[in-house]
């Protein structure tokens, strides 16, 4: 978590930096004492929360989230998405999500761009993309999302 603070020279001494790390861990719903652990000692959900704390450490305006929930089980995924929403309200940070998991769109996205082979093929409000997709690729992506009512 301290790496970004150190590389950007945020001007914190060791004690201030450790306090900031503790605060960030608590903000992402982890215990302060986890700051002394090695990465292999964390679960997938804990690792994702540490990654969020690392991003917040440098007080960004924008956080790029590349497949933030792809390796998480459904219950942990929901917790992480809820945490991201809380942090967005609290810190005023914006997110750019890169994901194949279209099921996260309703909970987080305001504006959506759909890319196919590196080019944006459709963009619009999250509601428009989800309810009235125009491009065949967007339609295919949405059709691939598992839904209970299709059974």
Regions found by a protein language model. Give the residues of each.
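Conserved ABC ATPase signature
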Residues: 38-42, 46
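Conserved catalytic motifs of ABC-family nucleotide-binding domains
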Residues: 59
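A short, surface-exposed alpha-helical micro-motif characterized by mixed small hydrophobic
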Residues: 105-107
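Conserved ABC ATPase "signature" region
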Residues: 6-9, 15-33, 142-143
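Hydrophobic anchor residue at the start of the ABC signature
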Residues: 52, 80
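Short, glycine/charged-rich "phosphate-handling" switch motifs in NTP-dependent
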Residues: 111, 123
């Amino acid at each position: 978590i301290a790496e970004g603070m150190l590389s950007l020279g945020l001007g914190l001494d060791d004690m201030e930096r450790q306090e900031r790390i503790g605060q960030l861990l608590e903000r992402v719903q982890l215990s302060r004492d986890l700051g002394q652990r090695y990465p292999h000692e964390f679960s997938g959900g804990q690792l994702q929360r540490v990654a969020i704390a690392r991003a917040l450490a440098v007080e960004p305006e924008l956080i790029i989230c590349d497949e933030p929930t792809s390796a998480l089980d459904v219950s942990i995924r929901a917790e992480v998405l809820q945490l991201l929403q809380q942090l967005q309200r609290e810190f005023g940070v914006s997110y750019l999500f890169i994901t194949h998991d279209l099921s996260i769109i309703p909970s987080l996205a305001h504006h959506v761009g759909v890319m196919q082979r590196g080019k944006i093929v459709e963009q619009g409000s999250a509601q428009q993309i989800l309810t009235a997709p125009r491009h065949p690729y967007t339609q295919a992506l949405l059709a691939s999302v598992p839904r209970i009512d299709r059974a």
